[in-house]
UniProtKB/Swiss-Prot annotation:
Signal sequence range: 1-38
UniProt name for this protein: Periplasmic trehalase
A GO molecular-function descriptor: alpha,alpha-trehalase activity
Organism: Xanthomonas campestris pv. campestris (strain ATCC 33913 / DSM 3586 / NCPPB 528 / LMG 568 / P 25)
GO biological process: cellular hyperosmotic response; trehalose catabolic process
Localization per record: Periplasm
Any one Pfam family match given in the protein's UniProt record, by short name: Trehalase
């Protein structure tokens, strides 16, 4: 029998379908939001209509934007899109057009005169003789931001409550990062802040119809891996089962977002996030509303599209954006040839991790509906069962692991990746599939420093040799649900050893880790290695709680300590 989740037990139209109507056999628009409850404003939330969202930087001052990004004024393309225009962007752009061809025009001076720079998140002012656990506890206040109001023309979106940012170049909240950060907040006793994070995401769902990639205007066209149901489950473990009913309206809207557009699909067709396979099964993919270069990686995307000689640039841009929505930006999973970014085809892939998370969302909706005393619980449970059957039919490789499915070529991937453990994390795997997946993962992905992301070295950051904290936790938690405690412990302890070794040497936690014996930070990708780091902090605390004998609570050796910066 499949395991149920083991822990606690396009916006949607305001008019919900009749309560308790059976969902099976009805159109997607009928079942994405059954029995919708009137949304009750969350305590302390901003309930007035938000100000009109400013256009993204590439649309607000297009000629200036392209000149800055093409001219590579800044090492990181995200840097400029986070700058604050000091006056109306249209006027700034007009002045640029009037001046830029004049002799002696200095683009950098023009930018400095018209924009305010956003500094990176600093986390290096903590005493350097603290142990790892105490260091993480001291990091939380440095990563907290409160932006209930933002200046006019900012790309930042206001949120009603404080929130935790990852660190470094990531000065805003991120959707899927935040679940792993919240695990650590709860473990640190910061349950109020964890609840505030959850309320912020509920606010984003109510305001924009979905949780965007992050709270920036240029992230609104997509989401990220749907972990809102896990956040609700986490908070229910703190406050009790009533949490499920409190967030039921937002859970339903979240589901509506991911299922929107599937009403009229015929077998072999897709719309937005929804794919109807040849046998009529409905599963999901990653998607983005826009098919233009990402503002935060504009030059990178235009160069990638230029290398794809046989494809329209818009298709490449959409797939790059969908890859960003996946959180795995980027990986061989999305590449047609397994190595070249310009062959990216994310929207052709039905990912095992996304569909596992949506199964958990359906199960959580069933649980939340049960608290209302309606039959909708049975309906969502039936939808979850349908998804499980489709996953077993299309995303299970007979070689012994879960994998991604290409719905356009009707082929199943033969690559073992860390995503194969998401069905265990979501509780949808059978005992046999869980055991065989564990065997495959041990043989293909176990490294000296933990769980590898994939077994391919491509230069992309979500491939060999990098290890990522969220994937370590998905693995450890998922394996433990199915009694694979030995492999879970091996992965968890090896990753803790990597975290501790780098911490002892450099007194910081980073976004990703190399998994070789030298315990270095990870590489690859579009930007330099970032420290802070939200999800690493959260997962490290969870692993320390599970495996305290690993000795990762020691303070860095004094001989390894960096000198304190000189006083100004």
């Amino acid at each position: 029998m499949p395991h149920a989740p083991a822990r606690s037990g396009d916006a949607m139209s305001a008019a919900a379908p009749p309560c308790c109507t059976s969902l099976l056999g009805l159109s997607l628009s009928m079942f994405v939001a059954p029995c919708a409850l009137a949304a009750t404003p969350l305590e302390g939330a901003v309930v007035s209509a938000p100000a009109p969202t400013p256009p993204t930087p590439d649309l607000a001052y297009p000629e200036l934007f392209q000149a800055v990004q093409r001219g590579e004024l800044f090492d990181d393309q995200k840097h400029f899109v986070d700058f604050l225009p000091l006056r109306d962007p249209a006027l700034i752009n007009a002045d640029y057009l009037a001046q830029h061809e004049h002799a002696g025009f200095d683009l950098r001076k023009f930018v400095d005169a018209n924009f305010e720079e956003s500094p990176p998140v600093q986390t290096d002012a903590i005493r350097q003789d603290t142990a790892l656990r105490e260091h993480i506890d001291a990091l939380w206040p440095k990563l907290v931001r409160s932006q209930t109001n933002v200046p006019a023309h900012s790309s930042l979106l206001a949120l009603p409550h404080p929130y935790v940012v990852p660190g470094g170049r990531f000065r805003e909240v991120y959707y899927w990062d935040s679940y792993f950060t919240m695990l650590g907040l709860v473990k640190s006793g910061e349950t109020t802040l964890s609840r505030q994070m959850l309320d912020n995401f509920a606010y984003l769902i109510d305001t924009y119809g979905h949780i965007p990639n992050g709270n920036r205007t240029y992230y609104l066209s997509r989401s990220q891996p749907p972990l809102f149901s896990y956040m609700v489950e986490l908070q229910a473990g703190v406050e009790g089962e009533a949490v499920y009913q409190r967030y039921l309206p937002q859970l339903q809207k979240e589901y509506a977002y991911w299922m929107q557009g599937g009403d009229d699909l015929q077998p072999g067709q897709a719309a937005r996030h929804v794919v109807r396979l040849a046998d009529g099964s409905v599963l999901n993919r990653y998607w983005d509303e826009r098919d233009t270069p990402r503002p935060e990686a504009w030059l990178h995307d235009t160069r990638t599209a230029a290398e794809a000689h046989d494809r329209p640039a818009a298709d490449v841009y959409r797939d790059l954006r969908a890859g960003a929505e996946s959180g795995w930006d980027y990986t061989s999973r999305w590449l047609a040839d397994g190595k070249t970014l310009s062959t990216i085809r994310t929207t052709a892939i039905v990912p095992i991790d996304l569909n596992s998370l949506l199964y958990h969302l359906e199960r959580t909706l069933a649980q939340a509906c049960a608290h209302t005393g309606t039959a909708c619980s049975q309906d969502y449970a039936a939808l979850a069962q349908q998804r499980k059957q489709a996953i077993d039919a299309h995303l299970w490789n007979a070689a012994g692991y879960y994998a991604d499915y290409d719905w356009q070529t009707r082929t199943l991937s033969n690559q073992v990746t860390a995503a194969a453990l998401y069905p265990l994390f979501a509780g949808l795997a059978s005992d046999d599939h869980a055991k065989r997946t564990a065997t495959s993962v041990r043989a293909r992905l176990l490294r000296p420093g933990g769980l590898a992301t994939t077994a391919l070295k491509t230069g992309q950051q979500w491939d060999e040799p990098n290890g990522w904290a969220p994937l370590q936790w998905v693995a450890v938690d998922g394996l433990r649900r199915y009694g694979e405690d030995g492999l879970a412990r091996t992965i968890g302890e090896r990753f803790l050893t990597q975290v501790q070794a780098l911490f002892a040497r450099e007194h910081k936690l980073v976004e990703k880790y190399g998994l070789d014996a030298d315990a270095a930070g990870g590489g690859g990708g579009e930007y330099a290695l970032q420290d802070g780091f939200g999800w690493t902090n959260g997962v490290t605390l969870m692993l320390l709680n599970l495996y305290p004998s690993q000795g990762a609570t020691q303070a860095p050796a004094k001989t390894k300590r960096k000198p304190e910066p000189a006083a100004p």
